[in-house]
UniProtKB/Swiss-Prot annotation:
EC top class, as a word: oxidoreductase
Active site: H456 (proton acceptor)
Record protein name field: Dihydrolipoyl dehydrogenase
Summary of subunit composition and partner proteins: Homodimer.
Keyword GTP-binding (UniProt): no
Cofactor(s) annotated in UniProt: FAD
Provenance organism: Trypanosoma cruzi
């Protein structure tokens, strides 16, 4: 039973519902721009899926398991003997992951205090377009007025109707991050970012991992050259198995295992059994309990909140950003950019997000990073383009540290030389893609990048060389 609802009559300028990457950034920026701001988050910890059960914990496990796998597979060739004897303590690995998460969530809460953002721990919902009710985690209930509201409630994993998550053997990404032991066998349904990253984590630790993907290839939104290189590396280095053009038609949770019925493109069916099943078939917008129907906020047929060019919803003074909206990829950094831009717009300033220059990264080994158009997209759109490529086996730094897998691929407009897309496969692709984003944001040509001095020896020289290939010839290949 809740206590009587306390109503605060002094309205906030902005209330943000959701404290994930989009929500907490919007809250801080709004406060920095002089608006009285509150943020409502029901998780009890700021940072959303990304910080608590997504981007950050997965990167902690990816790093730890890479070091472990590298010790067993590669230390000897570096002249470091005994790597095969390195053992893994799963509990300590999980503890390190949790330390990273705790430190960062605490850091965001500190930033709220520093910027004078009022933080409500509880579930927020609309009473009216200008009244927000909070059911607090402490059992208290409050209601307050707001001039404007930003919906930033993010998304949640999509489950299979015949195999609901139990987070023991049928896992969402959350469960796959917290397994207490290494399963002997794991099947991953969905060969996208989450499936490939988390499948890789457990493959490195000894699980036999099979990825089942409905599309003809994994990560189908990425450039095909990139996908082929990544899948080849994962199959070779981590012994992952891939079943593409394959659909899941049924399955049974046996309590300690899962029996999965799959059908290939030839119509042949087979049963695959595994100790752990990771379901990563996408995410859906989280709007439950928000009261959007009460105030008639429009959503599309998939449940995403419809927004206009300035993040406005169908209801005046109600805005939305991040995974919950019907625009752009479902990525944390996209939500952050929207958070800044939306807050700026509410403060009467120009705010803008360039949806054509939002990078995507898969943090496997090697990593994959892309920004802009793929070659397949340019062909489909009928754009005349040129391709410049440079392999890392011709890069001095990659040679020196024995990380020669991969390449840089640059796509430019054939007439103007303007960069249209950059695709990278290498151990540090996620770090290198930033330069490509900056170049594209400012409308650079491949000649601009190719004639820019890069430090030697660095992996970044491969981007310079790929650009040089488009305007003259590469020097080192």
């Amino acid at each position: 039973m809740f206590r009587r609802c306390a109503v605060k009559l002094n309205p906030y300028d902005v209330v943000v519902i959701g404290g994930g990457p989009g929500g907490y950034v919007a809250s801080i920026k709004a406060a920095q721009l002089g608006m009285k701001t509150a943020c409502v988050e029901k998780r009890g910890a700021l940072g959303g899926t990304c910080l608590n059960v997504g981007c950050i914990p997965s990167k902690a496990l990816l790093h730890a398991t890479h070091v472990y796998h590298d010790a067993h597979a590669n230390f000897a060739r570096y002249g470091l003997m005994g790597g095969e004897g390195v053992t893994m303590d799963s509990a300590k690995m999980q503890q390190q992951k949790e330390r990273a998460v705790k430190g960062l969530t605490g850091g965001v809460e500190y930033l709220f205090k520093k910027n004078k953002v009022t933080y409500y721990k509880g579930e927020g919902s609309f009473e009216t377009a200008h009244s927000i009710r909070v059911n607090g985690l402490d059992g208290k209930q409050e209601m307050f007025e707001t001039k404007k509201t930003i919906i930033a409630t993010g998304s949640e994993p999509t489950e299979l109707p015949f195999l609901p998550f139990d987070e023991k053997v049928v896992l969402s990404s959350t469960g796959a991050l917290a397994l207490p032991r290494v399963p002997k066998t794991m099947v991953v349904i969905g060969g996208g970012v989450i499936g490939l990253e988390l499948g890789s984590v457990w493959a490195r630790l000894g699980a036999k991992v099979t990825v089942v993907e409905f599309a003809p290839r994994c990560a189908p939104t990425l450039d095909e050259d990139v996908t082929n290189a990544l899948v080849g590396a994962l199959a070779k280095n981590e012994k992952m198995k891939f079943m593409t053009s394959t659909k899941v038609v049924g399955g049974t949770n046996n309590g300690d295992s899962v029996s999965l019925e799959v059908e290939g493109k030839n119509g042949k069916r087979e049963t695959v059994t595994c100790e752990a099943l990771l379901v990563s078939v996408g995410r859906r917008p989280f709007t439950g309990g928000l009261g959007l129907d009460k105030i008639n906020v429009a959503k599309n047929e998939r449940g995403f909140v419809k927004i206009g060019d300035h993040f406005e919803t169908s209801i005046p003074d109600v805005y939305a950003i991040g995974d919950v909206v019907d625009k752009g990829p479902m990525l944390a950094h996209k939500a952050e950019d929207e958070g800044v831009a939306c807050a700026e717009i509410l403060a009467g300033k120009p705010g803008h997000v360039n949806y054509g220059v939002i990078p995507a990264v898969i943090y496997t080994m090697p990593e994959v990073a892309s920004v802009g158009k793929s070659e397949e997209e340019l062909k489909k759109e009928g754009v005349a383009y040129k391709v410049g490529k440079f392999p890392f086996n011709a890069n001095s730094r990659a040679k020196a540290v024995s990380t020669e897998d991969g390449f840089v691929k640059v796509l430019v407009d054939k007439a103007t030389d303007r960069i249209l897309g950059v695709h990278i496969v290498c151990t540090t692709a996620g770090e290198l893609i930033g330069e490509a984003c900056l170049a594209m944001e400012y409308g650079a040509s491949s000649e601009d990048v190719g004639r820019t001095c890069h430090a030697h020896p660095t992996m970044s020289e491969a981007l310079k060389e790929a650009c040089m290939a488009l305007v003259a010839k590469t020097i080192n290949f």
